[in-house]
């Protein structure tokens, strides 16, 4: 269903958003200075490897770093996959405009307080537009 796919893509784009730092730390905030476009991003890691996949409407790219013999990666090595991914996907867009997905008619955006999960107010320190199926958004 294109409505749910749009919502999922938007959720995954929050991996590189500072709007959620109030209660958690998104996994790709270290990449924010490198990223000039909106990407849906999913990361994963174990003690011995790191994985990042990211995409737009134009491109899907993933990078894996790690060891096949279960040696632990260092913190520096664990950042390598993210940095290689960011540098490469940004190079792809060097002279191009990135396309993002068109919001379906049955999806609505609401300004949400990212700490409480409720509608944002003037007192909300961190806010983000989150997407919902029409009729399921917070009131």
Predicted region positions:
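A penicillin-recognizing enzyme superfamily signal
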Residues: 1-138
């Amino acid at each position: 269903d294109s409505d749910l796919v749009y919502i999922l893509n938007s959720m995954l784009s929050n991996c590189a958003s500072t709007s959620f730092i109030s209660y958690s730390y998104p996994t790709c905030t270290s990449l924010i200075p490198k990223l000039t476009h909106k990407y849906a991003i999913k990361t994963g890691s174990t003690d011995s490897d790191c994985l990042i996949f990211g995409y737009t409407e134009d491109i899907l790219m993933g990078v894996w770093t790690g060891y096949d013999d279960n040696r632990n990666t260092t913190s520096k090595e664990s950042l390598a996959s993210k940095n290689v991914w960011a540098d490469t996907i940004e190079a792809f867009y060097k002279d191009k405009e990135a396309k993002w997905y068109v919001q379906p008619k049955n999806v609505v955006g609401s300004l949400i307080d990212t700490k409480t999960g409720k509608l944002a107010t003037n007192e909300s320190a961190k806010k983000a537009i989150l997407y919902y199926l029409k009729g399921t958004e917070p009131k």
